[in-house]
Amino acid sequence: MHSRYRDGALLLAAFLLAYLLPLGFHGLWIPDETRYAQISQEMLHSGNWIAPHFMGLRYFEKPPAGYWLIALGQAVFGENLFGVRIASAISTGLSVLLAYLLAGKIWSDPRKSFASALLFMSFGFVAGQAGYSNLDPQFTLWTNLTLVAFWYAVHSIDRARLVAWTVVGVACGMGFMTKGFLAWALPAIITLPYMLWQRRLTELLRFGPLAVVIAIAVCLPWALAVHQQEPDYWRYFFWHEHIRRFAGDNAQHAQPWWFYLPLLIAACLPWALLLPVTFKQAWQRKSRPDTAFLLLWLVLPLAFLSLSKGKLPTYILPCLLPLALLMADALVEHLNQGRGRALRVNGIVNAALTFLGLLALIYVQLKQPVYENEPMHLLLAVIVLTGWTLTNALQGIRPLTFWALPAVGSWLLIVLLPAALPNDVVYNKTPDQFVARHQAELAACTHLLSNDLGAASALSWRLKRPDITLFNTWGELEYGLGYPDVQGRQVRLQGIDAWVTKARSEGRVGVIMRGKSDEELRELELLPKDGQR
């Protein structure tokens, strides 16, 4: 029991220091963070919790539950950087807890429970998303909860089994309310083959309908309400966000079928070189129900997502919890047997590559500086690379003693990296910091204009105003701009002179422009030259 308290305290400390502490110390990244911050803020201010709007325009790409939780964070902690990101951090923290609980349920081995949670929360991809405001950490939580509850359900009896199936239904419902039908597809393609293999299909047919009914009950009130408020919602959401993205020739974010294979390796850094021993042991134990379930959970969603034409890196987040458990199982078995070779190789290779990265940074900085008069940023970058090198080197030198140290390097990375980035990156990717520096002047403007959706949403969130006029840009807002009741929210090139003249006659005009591409420079040239810049 003492070791469990110690392990829990260590994981909680890591959560507080690595996940929560950095949330409020760097600007919102475009396009995701500014988008989700603004949509959820608009829900808070407008009171419309049914149909999502992005800068006052209909935005039907996702259901509202993810926005609700981000809005809750802003309501409780303030409309600030911490409030925008807290939902992602807590969602990831709860997924870490689920990894710990599932490992305990499967193996009843405190060391494997701790290793499962530690590996999962130090996977670079998981840790990075914990401090990033988007919907994937929330969706991953609901998917993880669905499958963990399923495992509890099929290993329980009587009332405990009914409670577990109820949790399956609630989690499926909330997953659907966060990202749509994928929340039902992923559990189905895992649980059905597993129960068939276990020859327990009758049990699934007996209790599965309970979860289905509860999931529908969770979703139905909102589904009916949004249909009444926005009759076109379901057509757009189903066909555009599901069918076209999955199978359309012009699918958004199109990638080749093998896209997720190298990404899976990168996602589990700094533990990637443990994958060979992980898969070797998993294959040897594939006839065991627990290993088979975890393999199905890892492989089948990965295959399903690979079939989709549209792919984003964060889609594989639900595959990482079972990978962490399989890896923890192999790692602890190696530790128990005194076999440190895989850990030694992992540590040495990580340390060597990071040290080479440190040398490359120094060389580039001397030849063609990446950091221009930014000694603190450069120092932090050196600290990050040095810390990663040392923690992994110690694992390589004494793998059986310092096996967990790469996790410290991973957490150091996510704490310091945002503050270690060059100003060129920060200014380009976090425009809300520029808006914050000029907030007083911009807040006094009657009209606001931008040629970039990321900058526009940052401006909208900082000033708590959805009425930003979009100059020659539309992108993901093309659908929302097509409604007749929002005409005038967009200005094309040929109409900018008339718009500026009219806007100036009504008060001050604030403009945030991006000027890197030839098209953007042309847009800048069309603006009046007599304005303050």
Curated annotation (Swiss-Prot):
A Pfam family reported for this protein in Swiss-Prot or TrEMBL: PMT
Pathway involvement of the protein, from the record: Lipopolysaccharide metabolism; 4-amino-4-deoxy-beta-L-arabinose-lipid A biosynthesis
Localization of this protein: Cell inner membrane
InterPro entries noted in UniProt: ArnT_tfrase, Glyco_trans_39/83, LipidA_mod_glycosyltrf_83
UniProt membrane topology term: Multi-pass membrane protein
GO annotation (BP), single: lipopolysaccharide biosynthetic process
Annotated TM spans: 10-30, 64-84, 86-106, 113-133, 137-157, 170-190, 207-227, 257-277, 290-310, 312-332, 345-365, 377-397, 402-422
Keywords: Cell inner membrane, Cell membrane, Glycosyltransferase, Lipid A biosynthesis, Lipid biosynthesis, Lipid metabolism, Lipopolysaccharide biosynthesis, Membrane, Transferase, Transmembrane, Transmembrane helix
GO cellular component terms given for this protein: plasma membrane
Record-listed E.C. numbers: 2.4.2.43
An example Gene Ontology molecular-function term: 4-amino-4-deoxy-L-arabinose transferase activity
Catalytic reactions of this protein: 4-amino-4-deoxy-alpha-L-arabinopyranosyl di-trans,octa-cis-undecaprenyl phosphate + lipid IVA = lipid IIA + di-trans,octa-cis-undecaprenyl phosphate
Protein family according to the UniProt entry: Belongs to the glycosyltransferase 83 family.
NCBIfam families reported for this sequence: PRK13279.1
Annotated function: Catalyzes the transfer of the L-Ara4N moiety of the glycolipid undecaprenyl phosphate-alpha-L-Ara4N to lipid A. The modified arabinose is attached to lipid A and is required for resistance to polymyxin and cationic antimicrobial peptides.
Record-given protein name: Undecaprenyl phosphate-alpha-4-amino-4-deoxy-L-arabinose arabinosyl transferase
Upper classification of the organism: Bacteria, Pseudomonadati, Pseudomonadota, Gammaproteobacteria, Pseudomonadales
Gene name for this UniProt entry: arnT
